[in-house]
Amino acid sequence: MEIKSICENKKQFLDLLLLADEQESMIDKYLERGDLFALYDSDLRSVCVVTRESDDVCELKNIATYEKWHGNGYGSKLLHYIFSHYKGKYTTMIVGTGDSPWILRFYEKNGFRISHR
């Protein structure tokens, strides 16, 4: 398994990013200014985008895993990688998400807590 930081041709990951954010126009707003990470296990499994929101806050804008690979821990591995990557750079990482029970469980299992709805 390998996680890569992607600096060029970020739109090549659009099909996967669209699984977590159905509006391409919204993805376009954060993709170029954000940091894109891709997790490979033989081939591409998951991606995420993190943006700087202030000196001490970053935001997880998008995290997606191909559906056939759900439940294999790829999303969690990617989250733990970015936690480590940004440790010391930011004091807070936020995420905005829907209220689907399975996605809330995923984020809570990986250390996020609900601050408001």
Predicted regions and their residues:
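A short, internal acetyl-CoA/4′-phosphopantetheine-binding micro-motif in the GNAT/acyltransferase core
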Residues: 63-70, 98
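Conserved GNAT acetyl-CoA-binding A-motif
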Residues: 86-99
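Short hydrophobic clusters on alpha-helical segments that form packing/core surfaces
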Residues: 60, 82-86, 103
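Conserved beta-strand in the GNAT
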Residues: 38, 43-64
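Conserved active-site alpha-helix within GNAT-family acetyltransferase domains
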Residues: 99-117
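Conserved acetyl-CoA pyrophosphate-binding loop and the N-cap/start of the following alpha-helix
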Residues: 69, 73-81
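Short loop/turn motifs at secondary-structure junctions and domain boundaries
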Residues: 27-31
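Short amphipathic alpha-helix that is part of the acyltransferase structural core
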Residues: 1-26
